[in-house]
Amino acid sequence: MTDSAKPQNPDPGHESRRVAPLAGSPRSPFLIEFPEDSFTAVFLGREKRFLVEAERNGHLFQAHCNNSGSMLGLLRPGSDILLSVSPNPSRRLPYTLESIKLGSHWVGVNTLVPNRILRLAWDRGILPELIGYDRFQNEKTSGESRLDAFAEGPAGQVWIEAKNVTLVEDDVACFPDAVTVRGQKHMRELTALARAGRRAACFFLVQRPDASCFAPADFIDPVYAELFHAAVHAGVEIWPYEAVVTRQGIALGRRLKVVGH
């Protein structure tokens, strides 16, 4: 039994600097860099929805998992995982699950990453879809939904929702990996914006390297898939991008084609 209130230091004798994942320097290929105090451990199980059990150097401890999806195909006991250390010394669980090793590559599971990558890519000017937008706002309310981003500038205005993708089936990156009522709501709002003549987009960050294209997971959430197709028909833009996830950090990779619509 592990102690969830006072997790043991998985690396005895090591004093953590408690630095959260950082924005990469302008010369770095990474948009997000993991600090030196991030560390690997062995995944043991998912105790609760937002809690994972891990082991390092013979010590059992718990870590926070902000991914509410099923993470289908990733939660294999014995797999290596990468954990970051919270800069908040009073947080009950100081460690956050960032990625899981699947075979020879890492899969990013932190659902806050797509929003950060979107903004950092805009800031560096490396996302073609956001060229001509010189103002960027995280989280903006539209109708009854709060969307992840809003950008405006000489090119106009664009509303954006960002999603994390970890599921790949037969070389196809698929979203979602579990039924998502919240995701359905966001897609409806994007569709309403597009039908009102506004530019709207959904940014899907595929945090693994083994997909050649992207499609909605109709075999998991047929309602979301139907809404996805209706959104595309209404003019909502789909931006699926591969993330290059390593032990050191995360970079923005190639854009994937959308299939099945």
Swiss-Prot record:
Quote the InterPro entries the UniProt record gives.
Answer: SfsA, SfsA_C, SfsA_N
Question: Pfam families this protein is in?
Answer: SfsA, SfsA_N
- According to the record, the residues making up region (Disordered) are 1-23
Which cysteines pair up through disulfides? They are none
Question: Which molecular-function annotation in GO is an example for this chain?
Answer: DNA binding
PANTHER family on file: SUGAR FERMENTATION STIMULATION PROTEIN A
Q: Which HAMAP family match?
A: SfsA (MF_00095)
The UniProt entry's sequence similarity note says: Belongs to the SfsA family.
Q: What is this protein called?
A: Sugar fermentation stimulation protein homolog
Originating organism: Syntrophobacter fumaroxidans (strain DSM 10017 / MPOB)
> Lineage of the native species?
Bacteria, Pseudomonadati, Thermodesulfobacteriota, Syntrophobacteria, Syntrophobacterales
Q: Which gene encodes it?
A: sfsA
